[in-house]
Amino acid sequence: MNAENTGSTSEVQLDNGIFRVTRWTIEPDGVIPMHRHDYEYVVVPLVTDSMHVRNADGSSTVADLKAGVSYTRAAGAEHEISNPDGTDDVVFVEIERL
């Protein structure tokens, strides 16, 4: 799936009603538009890089990713993810507990 030519693509690898596993790729200057996570989730970075996170309240931060080092976020997170300064794709797997 391409998020309307925003430079981000997603591929659902598994959705069994308990977990949804999605591989995301954000190209240089690409963005995953503002979205809300309805479920608790784990992110498994496949690259060592950084991405920009803009939250719904307007605050922003840089998330440093290390390949293979997972992190989790609570349900309700609402943000936009981008790769504005990247020269390579940012790639990660997102695992949602449905």
Language-model regions, residue ranges each:
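N-terminal first-folded block
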Residues: 2-34, 38
